[in-house]
Amino acid sequence: MDESNLLQGISMIDLRSPDAILSDYAKRYAHLLPELSPQLQQRMAYMPEPDAPRLPLTKPAWLSDRSCTLTPGQAIDRAQGALLGLAIGDAVGTTLEFRRRDQGQVSDMVGGGPFRLAPGEWTDDTSMALCLADTYASQGKFDFATFADAMVRWYRQGENSANGRCFDIGNVTRRALEGWEAQGLAWMGNLEASTAGNGSLIRLAPTAIFRRHSLSATWWESVTQSSVTHRAIEVSECCKLFGAQLHLALNGADKEEALSPKVRPLQPRALIINAGEYKHKTREQIRSSGYVVDTLEAALWAVWNTDNFRDAILLAANLADDADSVAATAGQIAGALYGVSGMPPEWVAKVAWSRHICELASRLFELAPQGDEMDELLSGSE
C-alpha cells in the first residue's frame, strides 16, 4: 500500500500515549509485521504432529540484505560519514543541550553548552561510539567484556574523551558500568521501562559499519551492543529499527528508500516510527528528550525534512533538550546518506579527532565480515 495514501487524513498519534491505546492504534500497520513461516510455526507448535517431516529453517524475507550499489570509494565515504556524522552532530548539538526549545539557537559548530566545551569537542555519545568501534577493531567481532571494559575506562579514566575526562554520562549508563565492575556478566540490570534512555542508540554506527554486509547480523548485534548498558525492550526495538535503516543507507539507499516503511517484527512504538508517521508531524509534535523513542523519532524527522547533512544537523540540534544526542543520531543516518563528501568542510576540519574517527570507520569497513552468518547458522541447523 502506498505510504502517502495510508497516512492521508490520519491524525498522528503521540508516542507517549498509554500502551493499550498505542497497541490498538498500531493495528493499522499490521501489514508491516511479518507472518510466521511454516517452519517457525512447526517449531512453536504446542502439540507437534509426531510423523510430520521437519521443515528446514530458512532466513525470512524481511531479513534479506541490501546489495551494495556503491563504488568502493562511495561506500567508504558513507561509512566514514556515519561515524563522523555522529561526532559532528554531537559537537553541534551540545551547545543547546539541556536548554528549553527556542531559548537559544545554533547555526554553526561553536561549542559552549552546559560543559563549556571548545568548538568541535563532543560528549558521551561519541566517546561511547569510539569505545564500541575500538572493540570491533581490536577483536574483529563484538566482544561484550572488551566493550564493557572500554566503557569503564572512559567512565573512570576519560579514555576516548575529547578532553581527557568523563564529564557527561547518563544515569542508566553509569548504573550499568558500576554493575559490570561489581558483578561482571552476572549483572542483569536496566531491564525496566523507566531505563529506556537513548544511550545505546546514539553510539550505534560502528555496529552498522562493521556488519554492513548482513542485515540479520546488524539487526541482532544492535541489541547485543545495547545490552551492555540498556536492556529495556523499547531500547532494543529502536536500536534494531535504526540499525536496519543504517544498513540500507550504508549500502546505497537514498533517503526515501532508507526511511520507507518495511516489513519488520516490531512492537507498537517502533512499528509506528517504522510506518513513517513522524514524516507528517509538525515541529511542535516532536519531542527531543533522552527517551529513546523521542530521540529516534526526532532524529528521523530532522533528516526526512531536509535534503543535506548540514540542514539535518541544525534542524535536529535546534530542537534543544537532549540536543546533542538527537543531533548525533541524526548525524549517523545523515552521514550514511550523504557521506563525508556531503558535509561542510569546516565542520569536518573543526570536529575533534576528525582524522582518527575517519580512520577508525575505514578500519571497521575493511574488517566487515563477508557473507551472511545467519545463512551459515541455518545451513547447519538440521
Swiss-Prot record:
One of its GO terms (molecular function) is ADP-ribosylarginine hydrolase activity. Residues 12-72 are annotated as: N-terminal extension. Signal peptide: none annotated. Its cofactor is Mg(2+). Binds 1 Mg(2+) ion per subunit. It is an enzyme of class 3 (hydrolase). InterPro entries: ADP-ribosylglycohydrolase, Ribosyl_crysJ1, Ribosyl_crysJ1_sf, Tri1-like. Residues 81-373 are annotated as: ADP-ribosyl hydrolase domain. Keywords: Hydrolase, Magnesium, Metal-binding. It comes from the Bacteria. Disruption phenotype: Decreased fitness in interbacterial competition assays against S.proteamaculans. Mg(2+) binds at T123, D124, D125, D168, D324. It catalyses: N(omega)-(ADP-D-ribosyl)-L-arginyl-[protein] + H2O = ADP-D-ribose + L-arginyl-[protein]. Its EC number is 3.2.2.19. Orphan immunity component of an interbacterial competition system (also called effector-immunity systems); this bacteria does not encode an identifiable cognate effector protein. Expression of this protein in E.coli partially protects the cells against competition by wild-type S.proteamaculans. Probably acts as an arginine mono-ADP-ribosylhydrolase, mediating the removal of mono-ADP-ribose attached to arginine residues on proteins. Probably de-ADP-ribosylates FtsZ and possibly other proteins. Belongs to the ADP-ribosylglycohydrolase family. This is ADP-ribosylarginine hydrolase Tri1. The gene is tri1.
